């Protein structure tokens, strides 16, 4: 059995470890575009607050660990195309430029997600950061040393956690959210209000129903955050506008929802029985938090 895993995310490496532990005779190949594997971005806030002391501890495993289990891991390799009809993939070696084909019996799509970059004027400003990967986590950590006033744009999980992290490090934090309550995809208004009170108790300035429309340079090397309600001068802004699944390789070949997340059954199989999906690339079939956001899941 030849299993191919695209993406060495937490989900991809966990799948490789499980397969090789239970079925060591399986030939497992992992293709990864980056030079590192299994970075757990959801724990970035733990690094910023010092609970995790070393950024390297945010890696779920290492290429050496996977090789020891028997996996063939190819970093700096970008999968260009998947042909599900013939069970082949086209891969580019990003260091040499070589392009080649490979085959699989079973494929696991663990390509994760990418940060949503909203169309905000000035979002490419040097004082505006994103939050997802290893390099961005290091930038955020360095920013703690030099900045006192920080604007967080977006109050989903990541934005809310970052607001708490920066506030705990004695930074002045403003949290902007275009919705009427924070964590609106996960919590109902009552629980969200309780979370807001906790943030405010830690001196986080929460701005609800306030959409950021632009970033410009201000006086004294400041960054100006522009909204319809007013302008705010800060030292740094971090945009946490959500994530989109990296599933373009399978678009039109397996069933997806309207956001591009791959639909799976209870065994994480896609509509193609030889292709599985895990992590941010696929839907979540059971989310108990939805019970608190809407009555519809209970109907």
What are these regions (language model features)?
Residues 2, 27, 140, 148-149:
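Residues that mark the start of a beta-strand
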Residues 1-72, 163-187:
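Beta1-alpha1 glycine-rich phosphate/pyrophosphate-binding loop at the start
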């Amino acid at each position: 059995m030849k299993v191919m895993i695209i993406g060495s995310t937490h989900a991809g490496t966990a799948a490789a470890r499980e397969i090789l532990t239970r079925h060591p005779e399986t030939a497992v190949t992992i293709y990864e575009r980056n030079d590192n594997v299994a970075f757990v971005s959801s724990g970035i806030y733990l690094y910023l607050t010092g609970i995790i002391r070393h950024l390297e501890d945010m890696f779920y495993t290492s290429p050496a660990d996977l090789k020891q289990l028997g996996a063939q891991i190819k970093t700096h390799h970008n999968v260009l195309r998947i042909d599900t009809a013939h069970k082949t993939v086209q891969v580019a070696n990003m260091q040499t430029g070589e392009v080649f084909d490979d085959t699989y019996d079973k494929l696991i799509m663990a390509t994760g997600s990418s940060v949503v970059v909203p169309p905000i004027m000035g979002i490419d400003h040097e004082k505006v950061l994103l939050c997802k990967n290893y390099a961005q986590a290091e930038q955020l950590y360095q920013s703690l040393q030099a900045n006192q006033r920080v604007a967080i744009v977006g109050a989903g999980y990541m934005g809310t956690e970052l607001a708490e992290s920066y506030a705990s490090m004695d930074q002045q934090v403003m949290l902007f959210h275009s919705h009427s309550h924070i964590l609106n995809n996960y919590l109902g208004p009552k629980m969200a209000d309780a979370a807001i009170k906790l943030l405010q108790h830690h001196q986080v300035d929460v701005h609800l129903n306030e959409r950021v429309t632009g970033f410009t340079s201000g006086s004294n090397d400041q960054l100006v955050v522009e909204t319809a309600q007013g302008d705010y001068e800060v030292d740094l802004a971090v945009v946490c506008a959500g994530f989109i699944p990296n599933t373009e390789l399978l678009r039109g070949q397996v069933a997806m929802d309207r956001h591009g997340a791959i639909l799976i059954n209870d065994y994480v199989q896609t509509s193609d029985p030889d292709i599985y999906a895990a992590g941010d690339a696929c839907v979540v079939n059971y989310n108990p938090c939805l019970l608190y956001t809407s009555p519809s899941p209970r109907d």
